[in-house]
């Protein structure tokens, strides 16, 4: 093989190896940051993976909020009106968090079927509902409380 061709081949091989390594690192980083959304029905049916960060959303059941007297631990139940799932959270809940309203909790599902959340997001106003929660309620045949919901703008 000609030395010039050999040098070009080595350069091309090195570039391809570098691009492959960069793609592997980028996809690995993206995989760690992906949080798939699951409804309470999907979680109760075992579709959500254990010990993997997920987003769980639905309506907070009225009367389900339990606060610890001596810590910031909170426990509540979220429903899609078909099935329910318990969520635990340690921290201060958002000011807009209310029973009977939509939320999205980010956390991990444990072996007992409880979502241990490290972040809780509440809806912004009376008519706003997270798009995932709106879709989940529509799929379950339920309407959002208080009339129609306004989904977030896409784009």
Curated annotation (Swiss-Prot):
UniProt key word Heme: yes
List the ranges whose topology is Cytoplasmic: 1-8
Q: Which NCBIfam families match?
A: PRK13254.1-1 (NF009727), PRK13254.1-3 (NF009729), PRK13254.1-5 (NF009731)
Instruction: List the Periplasmic topological domains.
Output: 30-155
- Extract one GO BP annotation from the record: cytochrome complex assembly
Origin: domain of life: Bacteria
Coiled-coil positions are: none
| Keywords in alphabetical order | Cell inner membrane, Cell membrane, Cytochrome c-type biogenesis, Heme, Iron, Membrane, Metal-binding, Signal-anchor, Transmembrane, Transmembrane helix
What range does the record give for the signal peptide?
none
What family does the Swiss-Prot or TrEMBL record give for this protein?
Answer: Belongs to the CcmE/CycJ family.
What is the protein name stated in its UniProt record? Cytochrome c-type biogenesis protein CcmE
* Example of a GO MF term: heme binding
Asked if the Swiss-Prot or TrEMBL record annotates the protein with the keyword Metal-binding, the reply is yes
In this chain, the stretch annotated as Disordered covers 134-155
Q: Which residues bind heme?
A: 124, 128
Topologically, how does it sit relative to the membrane? Single-pass type II membrane protein
Q: Which Pfam families match?
A: CcmE
Q: What is its main location?
A: membrane
Cellular compartments per GO CC:
plasma membrane
What biological function has been recorded for the protein in this entry? Answer: Heme chaperone required for the biogenesis of c-type cytochromes. Transiently binds heme delivered by CcmC and transfers the heme to apo-cytochromes in a process facilitated by CcmF and CcmH.
> Where does this polypeptide localize?
Cell inner membrane
Q: Which organism is it from?
A: Pseudomonas savastanoi pv. phaseolicola (strain 1448A / Race 6)
Report TM segments.
Answer: 9-29
Q: What is the lineage of its organism?
A: Bacteria, Pseudomonadati, Pseudomonadota, Gammaproteobacteria, Pseudomonadales
């Amino acid at each position: 093989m000609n030395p010039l061709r050999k040098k070009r081949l080595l350069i091309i091989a090195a570039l391809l190896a570098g691009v492959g390594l960069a793609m592997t690192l980028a996809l690995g980083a993206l995989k760690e940051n992906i949080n798939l959304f699951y409804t309470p029905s999907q979680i109760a049916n075992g579709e959500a993976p254990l010990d993997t960060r997920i987003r769980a959303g639905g309506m907070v059941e009225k009367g389900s909020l339990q606060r610890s007297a001596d810590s910031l631990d909170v426990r509540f139940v979220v429903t899609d009106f078909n099935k329910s799932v318990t969520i635990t959270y340690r921290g201060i809940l958002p000011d807009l968090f209310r029973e009977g309203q939509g939320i999205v909790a980010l956390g991990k599902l444990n072996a007992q079927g409880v979502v241990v959340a490290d972040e809780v997001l509440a809806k912004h106003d009376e008519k706003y509902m997270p798009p995932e929660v709106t879709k989940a309620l529509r799929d379950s045949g339920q309407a959002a409380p208080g009339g129609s919901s306004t989904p977030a703008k896409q784009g």
